[in-house]
Amino acid sequence: MAVKTTKTAAEDHLPTREEAEAAFAFALDARQDRVRAALDKLAADPPQVLILEGGSVEERFSVALWHAARLNCPEAQPPCLHCPSCLQIGASLFQDLYVLDGREGSIKIETVRELRTILGEAPRGDGKRVVILAEAQSLGVEAANALLKSLEEPRPGVCFLLPAPQRERLLPTLVSRGWVVTLAWPEADTPSTPELRQWEDALADFIGSGQGWFDRTSGKGAVDAALARRIVLSVQKAQAAVLARRHGGSL
């Protein structure tokens, strides 16, 4: 898994506004108003490490891209979401944006080492170099330790964004080095599909009895990455509903 950046494409091809803005759609949802306000305050002096927890996989990545645009948009009220920098970031083509993508698998130590060779360079533009470790809980132990070594050295102009379901799923030493911003939790009232409902029922039975789950999931191809994310999201929705009732209202 290589570090994803496309400098040539960023220079030679500018995506349409509609293509790029689609990447910001989840971040622009009214549910994330509080999150955008918090990130706006941090932008003047951004932390080197920012953990984005809560929300869904898509929401976390969208907010990370929005924050990258906020840090690099040259307009008076950033992010404008229509200048070349914002459009390139929305399409993941920006020259100072690097994505280590753990959404479909683990982030390997080789990828982090490749990144470290880049970090010694100054940003190519006037803003910040932004490194997004998408689903940072996918960092292997060796990769996480290699990242920690990079964080030991002050790197002006570089911001690491670590989207993850919960901060507890990251190494404590990583969490201790950064700020944490919590996205709005997934809405609890979205109905499940019949297929997902079967998995929800099976998981509930397993929690109650300790039986059946491993038989259901151990078959080859029984659970792919997309299904696993939907199951986790369903659990998060249920958790949000319980917490909302406990606190007498919505979160």
Language-model segments: residues:
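Cys/His-enriched microdomains
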Residues: 62, 78-81
